[in-house]
Each structure stands twice: as C-alpha cells, then as structure tokens.
A protein has these predicted regions:
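Outer-membrane beta-barrel proteins and related beta-barrel translocases across Gram-negative bacteria
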Residues: 1-218
Length: 218
C-alpha cells in the first residue's frame, strides 16, 4: 500500500493531571481511492479532583475504517472512547462511567457500536454481627444502546454474607448471597426473536468451604 503518514505525540503534566495525545494524519491508498486524506486521534486524560475522585477520559476516533490496521498504527477492530470517575472512601467504592465504541469493521458498523450512558456502580463491605463475619452490598445501573442492535436498561443488586470459623480440623467458611436483576428491553432488530418488555430475576446462592492451612519449615 502506498502513501505517507505522520504520527504526532503530545504530552502535558500539571498539578495532579496528565494529558497524552497521539494524532495520526495520512494521505494513503484506501479501498475507496488511490489517495485519501485520513486521520485519527488517541488521547488520554487523567486527573484527581475534589475529595479523592479519580477522573479518566479516553478519546479514540478514526475517519476511515481500515487505515489504522493496514499501516500498523493500531490493530484493534474497534475504538472505545470513555470517561469515568471513581472514588474509594474507606470500605466504599463508587464508579460512574460513560462510553461509546466505534467499530473498525464495516460488517457490524451499524449494529455493534455500543453506547453506555451511563454505568453506575456502588460497593460497600462492612463487618457483620460476629467477629469473622462480613457483609457486602453491590448496586449497579446500566443504560446500553446499540448492542447488536438492542437497547436496554439494567439494574442489579447483590447482598452477600460470608463468615469463617476456626476449628481444630481447619478453617470452615460459608458464603450466601442474593442477586436481583431487572431488565428493560426497549429496542430490538426486526428479525430478532427476543421480546420487548421488562424482566426481573431473583437468584439465591449458598456455598460452604473448608481448608487446612499447612506450614512448612526448612
């Protein structure tokens, strides 16, 4: 394949922030033309703001489907742009994220370019009523569009209780959880066999374990 390309890299650091940007520009042979002006960007920004919030943003976009792979700039078949903010405070974790995916394959370009607006996640772990008992709560919400031409919303929750017991014959443990999921499917392809509507699931689970710690000295 004939043509020429230019990759420009820019990096900037300040305070608690960092920006790294790669810009690709080229005049090359594509499947459309002998010479076509094409371009792409791959940029990453990270920062810590406020009271312990970690912010990350990625911008990845290309003006043409194949030139990044064909000329060895990037071998991925899709480019994902996203922005997220996360925070950990003691025994709690928070995450908010939005993303959009650009497919580099013409065959699935209109049906598999997922957009997430947004994804929200919360987790908390705390001691239970007894010394070696732990209680974990996990809650998440998701709006997902254009996933194989489906649009859906999902809410999930996990409530988990676990405990360990020291015995003369080793350590026994149990873990029990209750998982709840609620789905709202509000868009689908005409040919799909799935049905639009709302669905909910409640799933209990229980596991029991035993282990025997062994110490070896030399």
């Amino acid at each position: 394949y004939r043509g020429f390309g230019l990759k420009t890299r820019h990096r900037k650091l300040w305070d608690n922030s960092q920006l790294i940007t790669n810009i690709y520009s080229a005049n090359i042979e594509t499947y459309k033309k002998k010479r076509e002006l094409v371009g792409a960007i791959d940029s990453h920004f990270s920062s810590q703001i406020g009271n312990g919030w970690n912010v990350n943003a990625h911008l990845r976009r290309a003006s043409q489907d194949t030139f990044m792979r064909r000329y060895g700039f990037n071998q991925n078949t899709s480019l994902k742009s996203s922005i997220s903010a996360s925070r950990t405070i003691g025994n709690r974790y928070y995450l908010v994220e939005a993303s959009d995916r650009q497919s580099m394959l013409t065959s699935d370009k209109t049906t598999n370019e997922q957009t997430i607006l947004p994804y929200i996640f919360y987790e908390k772990e705390e001691k239970g009523w007894r010394q070696n008992q732990w209680f974990r709560t996990e809650i998440s919400a998701l709006q997902l569009d254009n996933d194989q031409d489906h649009d859906l919303a999902r809410w999930s929750g996990i409530f988990e209780l676990s405990e360990e017991f020291q015995t003369p014959l080793g350590v026994t443990s149990y873990q029990g959880n209750l998982t709840g999921n609620y789905y709202s499917l509000h868009e689908k392809p005409t040919a799909a066999t799935s049905s639009l509507g709302e669905y909910s699931f409640l799933t209990p689970a229980l596991s029991v374990g035993w282990r025997l710690p062994i110490a070896m000295t030399s």
